[in-house]
């Protein structure tokens, strides 16, 4: 059987004024990715799958994000806000290509899943001309009601127009819709604007399809999956729902989350086997964690790689570009940025390792700082394998510390150190016998 082609149109033209933000609504992040990114990730992918995004005038940032995520995306601009059907028809050029399945989604519903899109498409494959996504609302007030005759959808009744009996219905319209792509324009072009707002409503497609002798059906999903986001409070609710989903997926994959509700994950976080995450850990985008790794409490990780059997934290921070080799350890109050730590490296306490490459099995003592910035440019620190850096050491980059070299505690190292060398840089210690007693006695006499 030949695979069905698809066109997914994502409506992202809204201003999002209730967000009270200069950032376009669909670009607000959920689990480290924009809302738009989540919707596009759920849309059908691969051969025969096309994506179009409808944006508002001047929404260059939304266009840029869409193209970052899907280089082949088609961008269409809805010049006037005249309703959802009008927005869909902004992509007329793409619709006219006649994909088998036309999907209409919204850029502010980031919890939509690929499985739900697949179920909508399956309904079309089984002969429906229209499949509308519905949900059972806890409080249906304000939602359009889905009116059924047996298994067929006969109408979508807006709340304001619904009778008392219809308002008692809890099956509500989510807005997401699938349509027979070959019949889509014939249906959409029939939608009029004879209503109080003079707008073209996509929900009218149901009545038009039925008037053409075509079947419409409802596909049900959970209310959480289709919850739209219009305010920062709703954004927080969506974040909570997404985090619950990500935590459950991680635990299902074998990750131990000791206090799941306190751990924050990104949508693209990947885990190996037997990973343990302690409470109050934040994992941002671009993080992979290898087999047997342990992330202790109050650690923060972004765009970093943790190898197998690594230990991180507590109170550790990994910034972008950091890679921990197998068995490496980053301890408490250590920050690493753009640093490669080879297998077995230990940085146990109170250190900053930035723009650095640390060779295997090196030991970095407490209070070590790689001084990587001269006020204008960042510079590299290279530490060879098996090196020992004493406590309270400053390594002024650019600098190379040789393999198996020793750096004495309290040193400020400004020149390269060869392999197997010992480098010390500190003032000679001065000890004056009895001076403390003399100082103390003098102070006591002054207080009498």
Swiss-Prot record:
The keyword S-adenosyl-L-methionine does not apply. Residues 254-448 are annotated as: N-acetyltransferase. Residues 1-232 are annotated as: Pyrophosphorylase. GO terms for molecular function: glucosamine-1-phosphate N-acetyltransferase activity; magnesium ion binding; UDP-N-acetylglucosamine diphosphorylase activity. Acetyl-CoA binds at residues 366, 372-373, 409, 426. GO terms for biological process: cell morphogenesis; cell wall organization; lipid A biosynthetic process; peptidoglycan biosynthetic process; regulation of cell shape; UDP-N-acetylglucosamine biosynthetic process. Pathway: Nucleotide-sugar biosynthesis; UDP-N-acetyl-alpha-D-glucosamine biosynthesis; N-acetyl-alpha-D-glucosamine 1-phosphate from alpha-D-glucosamine 6-phosphate (route II): step 2/2; Nucleotide-sugar biosynthesis; UDP-N-acetyl-alpha-D-glucosamine biosynthesis; UDP-N-acetyl-alpha-D-glucosamine from N-acetyl-alpha-D-glucosamine 1-phosphate: step 1/1; Bacterial outer membrane biogenesis; LPS lipid A biosynthesis. UDP-N-acetyl-alpha-D-glucosamine binds at residues 11-14, 25, 78, 83-84, 144, 158, 173, 230, 319, 337, 352, 363. Its cofactor is Mg(2+). It is found in: Cytoplasm. It catalyses: alpha-D-glucosamine 1-phosphate + acetyl-CoA = N-acetyl-alpha-D-glucosamine 1-phosphate + CoA + H(+); N-acetyl-alpha-D-glucosamine 1-phosphate + UTP + H(+) = UDP-N-acetyl-alpha-D-glucosamine + diphosphate. Binds 1 Mg(2+) ion per subunit. Residues 233-253 are annotated as: Linker. Keywords: Acyltransferase, Cell shape, Cell wall biogenesis/degradation, Cytoplasm, Magnesium, Metal-binding, Multifunctional enzyme, Nucleotidyltransferase, Peptidoglycan synthesis, Repeat, Transferase. Residues 427-448 are annotated as: Disordered. The active site is at 349 (proton acceptor). One of its GO terms (cellular component) is cytoplasm. Pfam families: Hexapep, NTP_transf_3. Homotrimer. PANTHER family: BIFUNCTIONAL PROTEIN GLMU, NUCLEOTIDYL TRANSFERASE. NCBIfam families: glmU (TIGR01173), PRK14353.1 (NF010933). In the N-terminal section; belongs to the N-acetylglucosamine-1-phosphate uridyltransferase family. In the C-terminal section; belongs to the transferase hexapeptide repeat family. Catalyzes the last two sequential reactions in the de novo biosynthetic pathway for UDP-N-acetylglucosamine (UDP-GlcNAc). The C-terminal domain catalyzes the transfer of acetyl group from acetyl coenzyme A to glucosamine-1-phosphate (GlcN-1-P) to produce N-acetylglucosamine-1-phosphate (GlcNAc-1-P), which is converted into UDP-GlcNAc by the transfer of uridine 5-monophosphate (from uridine 5-triphosphate), a reaction catalyzed by the N-terminal domain. This is Bifunctional protein GlmU.
């Amino acid at each position: 059987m030949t695979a069905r082609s698809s066109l997914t149109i994502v409506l992202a033209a809204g201003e999002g004024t209730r967000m009270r933000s200069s950032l376009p609504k669909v670009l607000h992040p959920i689990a480290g990715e924009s809302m738009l990114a989540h919707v596009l990730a759920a849309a059908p992918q691969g051969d025969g799958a096309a994506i179009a995004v409808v944006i508002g005038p001047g929404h260059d940032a939304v266009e840029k994000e869409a193209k970052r995520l899907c280089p082949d995306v088609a961008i269409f601009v809805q010049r006037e806000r005249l309703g959802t059907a009008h927005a869909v028809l902004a992509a007329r050029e793409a619709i006219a290509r006649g994909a088998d399945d036309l999907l209409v989604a919204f850029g502010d519903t980031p919890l939509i899943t690929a499985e739900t899109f697949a179920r909508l498409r399956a309904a079309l494959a089984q002969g429906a001309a229209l499949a509308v996504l519905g949900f059972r609302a806890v409080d249906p007030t304000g939602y359009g009601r889905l009116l059924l005759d047996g298994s067929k959808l006969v109408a979508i009744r807006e709340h304001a127009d619904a009778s008392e009996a219809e308002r008692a219905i809890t099956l509500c319209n989510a807005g997401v819709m699938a349509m027979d792509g070959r019949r889509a324009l014939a249906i959409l072009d029939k939608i009029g604007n004879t209503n109080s707002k003079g707008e073209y409503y996509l929900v009218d497609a149901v009545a038009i399809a039925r008037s053409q002798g075509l079947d419409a059906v409802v596909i049900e999903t959970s209310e959480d999956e289709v919850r739209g986001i219009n305010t920062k409070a709703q954004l927080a609710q969506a974040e909570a729902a997404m985090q619950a989903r990500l935590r459950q997926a991680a635990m299902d994959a074998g990750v131990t989350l000791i206090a799941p509700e306190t751990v924050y994950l990104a949508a693209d976080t990947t885990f190996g086997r037997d990973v343990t995450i302690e409470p109050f850990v934040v994992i941002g985008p671009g993080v992979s964690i290898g087999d047997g790794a342990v992330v202790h409490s109050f650690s923060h990780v972004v765009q970093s790689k943790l190898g197998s059997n690594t230990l991180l934290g507590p109170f550790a921070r990994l910034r972008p570009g950091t890679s921990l080799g197998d068995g490496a350890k980053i301890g408490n109050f250590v920050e690493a940025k753009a640093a490669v730590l080879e297998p077995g490296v230990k940085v146990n306490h109170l250190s900053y390792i930035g723009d650095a490459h640390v060779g295997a099995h090196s030991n970095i003592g407490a209070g070590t700082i790689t001084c990587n910035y001269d006020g204008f440019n960042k510079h590299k620190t290279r530490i060879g394998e098996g090196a020992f850096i004493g406590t309270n050491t400053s390594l002024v980059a650019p600098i190379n510390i040789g393999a198996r070299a020793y750096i004495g505690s309290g040193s400020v190292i400004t020149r390269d150190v060869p392999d197997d060398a010992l480098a010390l840089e500190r003032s000679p210690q001065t000890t004056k016998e009895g001076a403390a007693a003399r100082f103390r006695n003098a102070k006591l006499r002054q207080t009498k």
